[in-house]
Amino acid sequence: MLIARSIADLRQALAPYRHPAFVPTMGNLHDGHIALMRLAKPLGDVTVASIFVNRLQFLPHEDFDSYPRTWEADCAQLQAVGCDLLFAPREADLYPQPQTFKLHPDPALADRLEGQFRPGFFVGVGTVVLKLFACVLGKTGGTAVFGKKDYQQLMVIRQMVQQLALPIEIVAGETCRAADGLALSSRNGFLSLAERQEAVALPLALQQLARRWREARNPGPALEQQALDALRARGWQPDYLTVCRRADLQPATAQDAPGTLVALGAARLATTRLIDNLEF
């Protein structure tokens, strides 16, 4: 596996190839990331991963410096899965000047759910992903693979690619889960043993919300409030548990048919904020 630190070295390494398959990450890799790498392998003539902890998507109260950096383990996992090229820029490489030019996604999509509770988050995500696309896929186009666990992020990136006419295919990987159903996440490492056992309550809450929504004659916000109250009673601090249309992430109504919906949730368990979703 070749490692490129600078944009110039990256572009030199990519010069022989016509269709890269790209998996951007912030490192601290787990089996979910590796599944995305496996999904990417047959989709291009070279498989590229990136590791970059993006300061722009951290809010002032979120500790950028405490995000886990596991460089040696990450490299070993990428090598084992057959990654051809790792782009691992230093901050000065990707942002040699203050990044004053930023991407502002459509507020109708980006300013609700995660965007409501983490204002400006998708500005940071959109800006770094667009810049990574320019570095890795800017010459030839190609394929980029993202996980469905970050559902709203996936939709923001898809909309960005569509509206900016980027020659990039976005492929979505299914959420990888532990045996008890908890979505794999870098944040799971912050959970204590007791918190890890309790954490499965979030996917269970989404399953119950989806089931009740399907069964109700007139589903709506009352069902979402019941789900919030039940999770809060277990000691969680939920931000949202809601049902949306998959097409645009706008609130679902009784007229929306099952098979077109997604239940999404975000909640804090002690000091760890977890997110998850369930299509139904």
Swiss-Prot record:
(R)-pantoate binds at Q57, Q153. Its EC number is 6.3.2.1. CDD domains: PanC (cd00560). ATP binds at residues 26-33, 147-150, 184-187. Beta-alanine binds at Q57. Coiled coil: none annotated. GO terms for cellular component: cytosol. It is found in: Cytoplasm. It comes from the Bacteria. Pathway: Cofactor biosynthesis; (R)-pantothenate biosynthesis; (R)-pantothenate from (R)-pantoate and beta-alanine: step 1/1. It catalyses: (R)-pantoate + beta-alanine + ATP = (R)-pantothenate + AMP + diphosphate + H(+). The active site is at H33. Keywords: ATP-binding, Cytoplasm, Ligase, Nucleotide-binding, Pantothenate biosynthesis. GO terms for molecular function: ATP binding; pantoate-beta-alanine ligase activity. Its main location: cytoplasm. It holds the Pfam family Pantoate_ligase. GO terms for biological process: pantothenate biosynthetic process. Catalyzes the condensation of pantoate with beta-alanine in an ATP-dependent reaction via a pantoyl-adenylate intermediate. Belongs to the pantothenate synthetase family. Homodimer. The reaction proceeds by a bi uni uni bi ping pong mechanism. HAMAP family: PanC. This is Pantothenate synthetase. It comes from Verminephrobacter eiseniae (strain EF01-2). The gene is panC.
